[in-house]
Amino acid sequence: LKSSHHIIDLKLSTIRLHDNSRFPWIILIPKRNKMIDISDLNSRDQILLIKEIVYVSKIMKKLFKTSKLNVEKIGNIVPQLHIHIIARTIKDSSWPLSVWIVKGKKYSKQSLMRALEKLRKGLNKKR
């Protein structure tokens, strides 16, 4: 949580902006304690999580005109269940390779405020 900023809360998940200005990168964190894998959620929450991933993915595509979305559930370093949704373009700094190969670049205060405002506005539109 230190390297991310709260955007909004959905029914199941908290949505946070990862503090890496190289990529539009958000993280969905289901508000369920001690969940590590999607299979740890009950079936109702599994379905809700998939719906939230699809909802957020569509908004990310629209807001950032992506070439490709990377949707990843890794959790090797932070075991708490969380999903990364990263908007990629063919012009980004690590295309077509993984975002993990380039060093992150923190948002400036001004660009962070703009990014959070853009995401909040986009994610609140269709709810």
Describe the predicted segments one by one.
Residues L1-R127:
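HIT superfamily nucleotide-processing domains
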